[in-house]
Every structure is written in structure tokens, then in C-alpha cells.
């Protein structure tokens, strides 16, 4: 079982169509599972914010915020783009860590460059943090 940890920054990269800096990983043919991890699991990030860490519009549990901390990310290979919405925005990094999204699996038929990135079509210059992904070949 092959495993790697990739840290995807939410910081701006104005040369990319996504507006943020993609991380490109060359993967061999096979089935892979992506897990969002945090710093306690060897990641470089716990969560990311698209609004300088501002929090607003949360429910009483600290979830479903209009602005907050999140784990949403996307990845693409060939003509495929997969957006993993995460679990929405949360009122704290701690709450976001407690509410990580479910694992995502995909299969590659050939050796392929896969790009991982966060999507912020608004203003990526006010982003903080990033998302850490563990990619495991099954």
C-alpha cells in the first residue's frame, strides 16, 4: 500500500485557473483513497478559510456557517474534475477538524498527473490555511 501526504495551500496563485496553488502528484495506475487529515495525523494544515478567518451565520452547533473554516477541495486528472465539498463551514478550526469529510476514492487506468487544489473563485488573497490530504493506493 503506497501512501503520501500532500498539503494544498489556499493561498493565491494567479497563474492557475483555480485561483489557488495546485499540488500535482504523479500517480500510477490503480485505485486510490483520499482522506482529509490534520496536523495531529502528519498534515501541514488543519483547515482553511476563504475570509481571513472571519466567522458568521453559524447554527448553535457551530456548523453551517456563511463564513468559517472548511475542508473543501478539488482534484482533476485528464478531463475529469472532482469537487469534494467537505462538510461546509464551521465556527472554529477545532470544529472543522471534528467534521472532516468522508474519504473519496477514484481509479486511474494509466500513470497520470493529478492536480489537487482548493476552489475560491472570489478573492483568494484573503485565504488562510489549507487542506492536507493523505492519498493511499489500495
PLM segments and residue spans:
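Acidic, Ser/Thr/Pro
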Residues: 1-138
